[in-house]
């Protein structure tokens, strides 16, 4: 019984590591934006739609046209 619990906890920890690693990667500015000297480094992989009326979570920016549109 303890070994099953241990395996379950290890799988849960591995899943959390993968999720947090993907989340941290999504916060990085796109290499293309850095190359072009774009002053709005807010064009990121993680963005939120504007139907949330600018109420984005985790410091994301709101774009009317997906992640590449102008920031609202």
UniProtKB/Swiss-Prot annotation:
Annotated keywords: Disulfide bond, Ion channel impairing toxin, Nematocyst, Neurotoxin, Secreted, Signal, Toxin, Voltage-gated sodium channel impairing toxin
Paired cysteines (S-S): 47-62, 48-56, 50-67
Any one Gene Ontology cellular component term annotated for this protein: extracellular region
Molecular functions per Gene Ontology: sodium channel inhibitor activity; toxin activity
Localization annotation: Secreted; Nematocyst
InterPro entries associated with the record: Neurotoxin_3_Anemonia, Neurotoxin_3_sf
Signal peptide: 1-21
Keyword hit for Disulfide bond: yes
Propeptide position ranges: 22-42
Main localisation: secreted
Source domain of life: Eukaryota
Record carries keyword Disulfide bond: yes
Family classification: Belongs to the sea anemone short toxin (type III) family.
Function: Voltage-gated sodium channel (Nav) inhibitor. 1 uM completely inhibits insect voltage-gated sodium channel inactivation (DmNav1 from D.melanogaster).
Designated name of the protein: Delta-actitoxin-Avd2b 3
Lineage, opening ranks: Eukaryota, Metazoa, Cnidaria, Anthozoa, Hexacorallia
């Amino acid at each position: 019984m303890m070994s099953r619990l241990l395996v379950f906890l290890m799988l849960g920890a591995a899943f959390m590591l993968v999720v947090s690693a993907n989340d941290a990667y999504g916060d990085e500015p796109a290499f293309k934006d850095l190359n072009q000297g774009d002053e709005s480094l807010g064009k990121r992989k993680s963005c939120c739609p504007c139907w949330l009326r600018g109420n984005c979570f985790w410091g994301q920016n709101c774009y009317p046209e997906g992640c590449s549109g102008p920031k609202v």
